[in-house]
């Protein structure tokens, strides 16, 4: 998302018309629509796997469901914005005074898009907090059931609703944009702060997840818990869950960082780039949909991987006669 300079009228300039009707824009819409459809399909599969595979604690499950909700809200609204732009690029290709949108017209769609972006990222941080609780207070966390996830999800939703409202404080909505994907000009400074905040949260999440993984590995190896099945199960559950959350955080960090870096670079060199090319590049620099689709994709992959590892070890245990030492080694691998 990036701001566009306001014009004195709603009519598009020659460069803006080139942007609105360009082949690159139309190809981008088609690709992003395919990504959105893949997101819907993978979400359905991820929900099914989450239901039948008891890998995560109920609190973590609540947060993962919330993440999938935000991912799909983002996919739906972005697909609507993109395809509206595609239709207008054909039907209004010879009407420069109708093809542009006012920021007031785009207000609702832009707010929902920001809500989706914020939710995906805020909830990732919520998942990290959930993993932190499972590591610091494992016994209490285990007895609280879904409560931590519910509380964190409510906070995430509230902050995500507040994000577009705060960004738009005092904005007169008196400029024009190519479509509802772009921030209003007067909101750009707060939008930049918003993007920096998201990047900071994702970096913090990755850092904390690595610490949590290390802590759980150390705790799992502790002699005092070696013969207590419940405690070892809690440590193993926390470790597996945190590893999966870390993979998701890393993919979202990559998507957001690519977006922020590329858009910042484009803004710094905006005066050197024709406006039609500049805004097309901003479209292509929007990598958030790829970060979003990685959530259900990685959930499916990692959960299936954990299940396959367990089945392989169990099959090896039951398929041959082992010495006591080999049997203990197999059991140790099963725990891993």
From Swiss-Prot:
Expressed in the URX sensory neuron, the ALA interneuron and in additional interneurons, pharyngeal neurons and muscle. It comes from the Eukaryota. The chain crosses the membrane at residues 29-49, 62-82, 108-128, 149-169, 193-213, 244-264, 281-301. Residues 50-61, 129-148, 214-243, 302-336 are cytoplasmic. GO terms for cellular component: membrane. GO terms for molecular function: G protein-coupled receptor activity; olfactory receptor activity. Pfam families: 7TM_GPCR_Sra. It is found in: Membrane. Keywords: Membrane, Transmembrane, Transmembrane helix. It is a multi-pass membrane protein. Residues 1-28, 83-107, 170-192, 265-280 are extracellular. GO terms for biological process: detection of chemical stimulus involved in sensory perception; sensory perception of chemical stimulus. The keyword Endoplasmic reticulum does not apply. Belongs to the nematode receptor-like protein sra family. PANTHER family: SERPENTINE RECEPTOR CLASS ALPHA-10. This is Serpentine receptor class alpha-10. The lineage of its organism: Eukaryota, Metazoa, Ecdysozoa, Nematoda, Chromadorea. The gene is sra-10.
